[in-house]
Amino acid sequence: MEVNVKGNYVQVYVMLPLDAVSVNNRFEKGDELRAQLRKLVEAGVDGVMVDVWWGLVEGKGPKAYDWSAYKQLFELVQKAGLKLQAIMSFHQCGGNVGDAVNIPIPQWVRDVGTRDPDIFYTDGHGTRNIEYLTLGVDNQPLFHGRSAVQMYADYMTSFRENMKDFLDAGVIVDIEVGLGPAGEMRYPSYPQSHGWSFPGIGEFICYDKYLQADFKAAAAAVGHPEWEFPNDVGQYNDTPERTQFFRDNGTYLSEKGRFFLAWYSNNLIKHGDRILDEANKVFLGYKVQLAIKISGIHWWYKVPSHAAELTAGYYNLHDRDGYRTIARMLKRHRASINFTCAEMRDLEQSSQAMSAPEELVQQVLSAGWREGLNVACENALPRYDPTAYNTILRNARPHGINQSGPPEHKLFGFTYLRLSNQLVEGQNYVNFKTFVDRMHANLPRDPYVDPMAPLPRSGPEISIEMILQAAQPKLQPFPFQEHTDLPVGPTGGMGGQAEGPTCGMGGQVKGPTGGMGGQAEDPTSGIGGELPATM
């Protein structure tokens, strides 16, 4: 029976602290981390995930890479017998309330921005977001003769060359490629440092000169050189009904509105496609999984316009699947989706935000599975209670345990955010160990589960028109069971109600939480976990 049940095993990883390598690019917490890793091994965890910060490694100058601290960290992980998921973190860490760590993108890159501030994402008020370079400069050779895509490719190449021993040994099994703020493939549409607060719809962030020029050229190409960006979209903290664009039957449905939304979201897909193609070339032949992170924009999901998703770059409507198009692009690169919100329940959300995290998770996971992708998830808030763990378990195997082999649909892996003493002590640790056992289908930890084949070359380039064929018709998601069939202990009354956006911005669990909800210690949807940073 065990041989058949083994196909239900879902790997569990734990995200390391944001400052596992210090802001001075030194490995200073070896003793503390070593003790915590022992606890993870005891719990049966398969591996860990870590941000590999661009701002630290290439901080001293163009191509002046310093990997020494990360090598020490990776050696510690290897000695613990754990696998490693490495995030190519091309974004800034820090800049918001609650962020204990501040790691900007390299100073020499920011210096280019003093001469040309349009290298940064820009909102309609002219405010620059310095957490991540605008996709408008992907192919612009503005950075000491290199384009943004070339800088990212060179960084990944140097990583491969310097971490070859860990790649060859099978320690590094996953390369998650940062594609935007908080490491997510999205626009910085809801920056707290610009005054955004939950559940604001956010704003379209495409006002740098490079994206403006691209839009004008695209509009002229379809015979409408007079078209401008929409001016009826409201501001960061509006609700959909307060805007002409997002309200029911609003101008987002007009010819001009549809053209703009397609242009905005298509550029994001092309951005991901370009950088993943480079990542594929860099890691070609190595036994690694390429992955990207998609943000869980769950607020306003229940309104027709899906306003907050649209401003983030996810063109998702009741009759248009904005996530399957992304999955179709990823299929070319055999890359996986890493999604968040896996622990969230609709009933924990504020009714005014029209949130539906459970339906969103169901849609995104189904989109990935329909395209034949490996699909992974994370939690949004640090939670330690059976209620949250059981929601994750339900999403990990939405049809339950299959006694005769691998289930038709299951997560490829789950990453818990994040490692702390609170996780590995007392009842929290007891619950976590039980959760890991349940994710493993009550089987012993297996370091050889889901072996990776050498990464093949990406498939032939496909046109955006072919990618968009995945958007319609929008199919119903696969059915999910209401509850897991392999639960962690009692579930009653242990959740609490989420007051803020808990996928991408933190938020606080409202009401009695019994030590299980609390405030997000840091990023809740970002690859590294930090809140979206803007200045």
UniProtKB/Swiss-Prot annotation:
Sequence repeat positions: 489-499, 500-510, 511-521, 522-532
Keywords linked to the UniProt accession: Carbohydrate metabolism, Glycosidase, Hydrolase, Polysaccharide degradation, Repeat
Pfam assignment, any one: Glyco_hydro_14
MF terms (GO), sorted A to Z: beta-amylase activity; identical protein binding
Protein's UniProt keywords contain rRNA processing: no
Superkingdom: Eukaryota
Quaternary structure note: Monomer.
Name of the featured protein: Beta-amylase
